[in-house]
């Protein structure tokens, strides 16, 4: 008999068929309590769980006593209670490699669009403000040869450094938990403490996961150390930044602009002050959102779940220590 799994995300037909070759699949729209109650028997017998964006906590795990592996269609997993998974020896799989290049493209797009005010001036054209040759009030700032500060030199940070170094001749500063020899050798990146980076960088790009240590890592004190001409980019997780402090820094001119793909609350409330600031480019968490990459992420998540339930945790496993 095939193992049973819960699928809480729509998949392309070919990937759904691949799952069905290996498992008995119960599809549900979400993991809300009423959905779990409606499909109680399926949840109680499920050995696998696959989807994205929903919260997986102790309350849900209590309804899934046979669960052996969960696979998320994402690189981030802050919506999972990892301690609760570990306590129950449930493997957690994610997709850290397939989205690297696409997310780095998005970060570079934020750098360019904020510096050159692409979104702002495009809207001015659309509403009929381009009635004569443009003047300095339409000008942006250069990107090439400006100093890029990367906070978090993981796979995405490395891919961003490659684009900045070779494409725009940008000197690279970085701060991370440890030195990154590849970044230093390939892109002449220079490791420095966070304060030094904040004071020297023209662009500060935050690419960090959300953990207890990184929550509100960036607040008023950090923005105060940045140049008044600096542009801040966040493409990691929203709660790494104290959004109230960011808004204050933007409104006061303490920093020049911000390009944001993530927020403390998502979707971003329509009354957020960020949406009324012309020096903010706000995206709806589209870092990996291309047709190609989202398909590849889903395919990776499917393969991850198949591997996990076969006891293969050599790659893409958050907590391999719980494997039996």
From Swiss-Prot:
It comes from Citrobacter koseri (strain ATCC BAA-895 / CDC 4225-83 / SGSC4696). It comes from the Bacteria. SUPFAM superfamilies: Formate/glycerate dehydrogenase catalytic domain-like, NAD(P)-binding Rossmann-fold domains. One of its GO terms (cellular component) is plasma membrane. PROSITE patterns: D_2_HYDROXYACID_DH_2, D_2_HYDROXYACID_DH_3. Catalyzes the NADPH-dependent reduction of glyoxylate and hydroxypyruvate into glycolate and glycerate, respectively. Its main location: cytoplasm. Pfam families: 2-Hacid_dh (PF00389), 2-Hacid_dh_C (PF02826). Belongs to the D-isomer specific 2-hydroxyacid dehydrogenase family. GhrB subfamily. It is an enzyme of class 1 (oxidoreductase). It is found in: Cytoplasm. Transmembrane segments: none annotated. This is Glyoxylate/hydroxypyruvate reductase B. Homodimer. The keyword 4Fe-4S does not apply.
